[in-house]
């Protein structure tokens, strides 16, 4: 059913970002719940079949895949944005041109989809790697909260929330570097967009709540100690 919903989302929105996020998150949670690799393989197969079917009928997705193969080949048309992103990253080098000295305005939608390009240009590979390391720590702590949760619902919820952030970072980083097609997903807590920022902060609040519950000492039940004593006296 989730596969069908994801396909409908791709067909209606003519974009595979939200569908990819939904399907990959659910697939990961199914694996966490069952531990069965076969479900992962079946899910990946369905994802490949659905993605190929939508690719055949979506001109927008075909262009994005073409940009991955060779963005510079279409520099004057639909390859301009990813080409400028690659130029910005290469211009940044290892240490960047300096905070505030870059030209993110040359990359269309740099404040949203391509925010990592602006960071890479001004802070270089070192600065961009530091940002990604912070996200990695955040994701790791999310999975740690999942392992520490005391009930199965909390474990699955925390794992799914951490996986949502991980998928977004992986897909966005691959997209801005032209290793993956751009999906329209935003960089959590950084890209412009009120609804995305609000959703990610709600996600963060849920993770903090689960972590707090896991670290809270177990409540002492005095009645549990009285019952055996009462039974012994009787």
Question: Where would I find each of the regions flagged by the language model?
Answer:
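Re-entrant/interfacial helical elements at transmembrane boundaries that shape
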Residues: 21-22, 100-105, 134, 177-186, ...
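Transmembrane alpha-helices of multi-pass inner-membrane enzymes
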Residues: 180-223
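Transmembrane helix boundary and interhelical junction motifs in multipass membrane proteins
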Residues: 15-20, 96-99, 110-112, 125, ...
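Long extracytoplasmic/lumenal interhelical loops at the membrane interface
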Residues: 89-126, 146-149, 153
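Hydrophobic alpha-helical transmembrane segments of multi-pass inner membrane proteins, especially
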Residues: 1-78, 117-177, 202-206, 221-234
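Residue-level marker of motif borders
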Residues: 9-10, 91, 179, 186
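Juxtamembrane loop-helix boundary motifs flanking transmembrane segments in multi-pass membrane proteins
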Residues: 77, 81, 107-115, 181
């Amino acid at each position: 059913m989730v596969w069908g919903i994801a396909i409908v989302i791709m067909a209606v929105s003519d974009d595979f970002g939200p569908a990819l996020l939904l399907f990959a998150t659910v697939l990961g949670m199914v694996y966490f719940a069952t531990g069965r690799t076969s479900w992962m393989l079946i899910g990946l197969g369905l994802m490949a079949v659905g993605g190929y079917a939508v690719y055949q009928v979506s001109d927008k997705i075909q262009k994005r895949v073409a940009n991955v193969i060779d963005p510079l080949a279409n520099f004057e048309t639909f390859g301009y944005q990813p080409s400028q992103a690659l130029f910005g990253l290469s211009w940044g080098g290892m240490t960047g041109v300096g905070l505030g000295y870059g030209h993110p305005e040359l990359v269309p939608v740099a404040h949203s989809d391509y925010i990592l390009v602006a960071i890479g240009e001004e802070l270089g590979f070192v600065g961009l790697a530091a940002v990604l390391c912070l996200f990695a720590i955040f994701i790791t702590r999310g999975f740690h909260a999942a392992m520490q949760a005391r009930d199965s619902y909390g474990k699955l919820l925390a794992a799914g929330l951490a996986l949502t952030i991980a998928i977004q970072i992986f897909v966005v980083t691959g997209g801005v570097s032209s290793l993956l097609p751009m999906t329209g997903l935003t960089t959590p807590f950084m890209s412009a967009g009120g609804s995305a920022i609000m959703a990610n902060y709600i996600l963060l609040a849920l993770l903090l709540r689960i972590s707090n519950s896991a670290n809270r000492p177990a409540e002492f039940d005095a009645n549990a100690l009285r019952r055996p004593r009462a039974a012994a006296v009787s």
